[in-house]
Structures are given as C-alpha cells and as structure tokens.
Amino acid sequence: MPRFHVSHRKDGKFERRGLRSYFEYRDLGIKRVTGGKVVAHVIRARPGSAPHGEWHYHDCAVQFVYVLRGWVLFEYEGVGRVMMKAGSCFYQPPRIRHRELKHSKNLEMIEVVAPASFKTFAATPAARKSPARRSPG
C-alpha cells in the first residue's frame, strides 16, 4: 500500500534526465511511493533548447498534464493544433500520435503518467493534415 508522501519545491531539483532533451524534470517521488504504478514530475523548458517536433506516441494507460506557467503548442492526430496556456490541463488518450511544435521560455507543467515506466515510439500520423482546433480559454 502506498504511504503518505510530500515533495516540497525547495527540496526538489531539476535534472536534465528525462524523455526530452529540451526539458528539465523534477521528480515528485510518486513513482517510488506507488511502487511504479504512477510517475509525476514537474517539467520546465530547458534554456536555449527547442522542441524537435517529432511525431510520437506513448504506450501508457493514463497521461495527464497541467500547465503551471507559460504555454505549449501541440499537434494531435485527428485533432489538430492545440495551444495550452497556464491553467490549461489535458488528458492524452493512450497511444494518441502527437508532437510538440513550440513552447515559451518559461514553460512549466506537471505531468502524471501511469504506469510509471512506459515506452515512447516514433510515429507518422495516418492523416498528416488535421483540422485546426483551438482550446477555449
């Protein structure tokens, strides 16, 4: 059974280890206390780095992101381009093909994924042209 856990900002540190080289990640300790069932981390833009815009998908059951500050522009297969701003949250269905197009220098977001260990695969969307879609807000 998971135990109670707290992670304070002042005690955490950002590391350049993670899925994307253009981000820094601060582990929130959730993977350890859930025995690998869930991972949660704060992600922020790495200074001087930009996204590659590569299409990919994640083999996971749940992926949820909440934008703390800044903005990020994604493109999803079958959905189109979606701009996320501070206060936006999104759930990505399992294996949805997507890519990040760009983000602000001050981007910071929380990501929660289950299971904690998941695979990411390069992908090409079946339909390259997706209708533009704007998120409210």
What kind of feature is each model-predicted range?
Residues 1-16, 99-137:
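Double-stranded beta-helix
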Residues 14-56, 61-62:
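A short glycine-rich, His/Asp/Glu-containing loop-to-beta-strand
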Residues 30, 45, 86, 94, ...:
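Active-site donor-binding loop signature of nucleotide-sugar glycosyltransferases
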Residues 42-45, 57-74, 112-115:
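Short, conserved beta-strand element in jelly-roll/cupin
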Residues 42-44, 88, 98:
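Hydrophobic/aromatic beta-strand elements that line small-molecule binding cavities or substrate pockets
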Residues 66, 91, 101-102:
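Well-ordered beta-strand positions
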Residues 77-79, 102-103:
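Conserved catalytic-core motifs of eukaryotic protein kinase domains, centered on the activation segment
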Residues 78-95:
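Short acidic-glycine-tyrosine-enriched beta hairpin
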